[in-house]
Amino acid sequence: MQCPHCHHNGSRVVDSRPTDDGRVIRRRRECESCGFRFTTFERVEVTPLLVIKKNGTREEFNREKVLRGIIRSAEKRPVGMDVMTQIVDEVENKIRALGVSEISSQLIGEYVMNRLVDVDEIAYIRFASVYRQFKDTGVFFNELKDMLDKDKLKAKKETNGKSEAK
C-alpha cells in the first residue's frame, strides 16, 4: 500500500479489526520508509445483480422488494417476520451462488414460491397469483389442484413411511 505521506510502496499492518457488522476491516498501517501511520478500509466488492423484468427492462436486485412481496402474501397469516427474512436470505444466497450477473424476475418468483409452499400454502397461493398472473379461475384452480395433489402425495409417503417402520 502506498504511503500517503512519502508515496513509498511498502507498509506493514500494525492493527486490524472488523467494523460495520463485520463487512469492513479497518487496518492501521505504518510506512516502512518514513514511519507515517495511516488507516485503510477493506471491504468485499459485490458485483451488482440485475433483474430482468417481464417487460425486458433491467433493474438492480432489491431484496426489500422481494420481502415486501412475501409480507403482502403472508398478511394476516401465521408467518413470522424472521421466517420471511430467512426466505429472502435463502433466495438471495441461491441467486448469488449461481454466479450470474442477470436473472429473470420469473426465476426469483419461482425460488420464493418453492420456499413459501412449505411455510404457508395460503401465502404461497397469494404470491403465485401475482407472479404467475392467473388470467382466470381455471388457471387458479389448476394451481390449487397441483398443490393439493402434492399434499396428498406427501401425506401418502408419510403414511407409508410410518407403516414400514412398524
UniProtKB/Swiss-Prot annotation:
Entry protein name: Transcriptional repressor NrdR
Cofactor binding, note field: Binds 1 zinc ion.
Organism name: Levilactobacillus brevis (strain ATCC 367 / BCRC 12310 / CIP 105137 / JCM 1170 / LMG 11437 / NCIMB 947 / NCTC 947) (Lactobacillus brevis)
Stretches assigned to the ATP-cone domain: 49-139
HAMAP family, alphabetized: NrdR
NCBIfam families hit by this protein: transcriptional regulator NrdR
Primary role: Negatively regulates transcription of bacterial ribonucleotide reductase nrd genes and operons by binding to NrdR-boxes.
GO biological process: negative regulation of DNA-templated transcription
UniProt GO molecular function: ATP binding; DNA binding; zinc ion binding
Keywords of the record: ATP-binding, DNA-binding, Metal-binding, Nucleotide-binding, Repressor, Transcription, Transcription regulation, Zinc, Zinc-finger
Co-factor requirement: Zn(2+)
Zinc finger boundaries on the chain: unnamed: 3-34
Pfam families reported for this sequence: ATP-cone, Zn_ribbon_NrdR
Homology family: Belongs to the NrdR family.
Source taxon at top rank: Bacteria
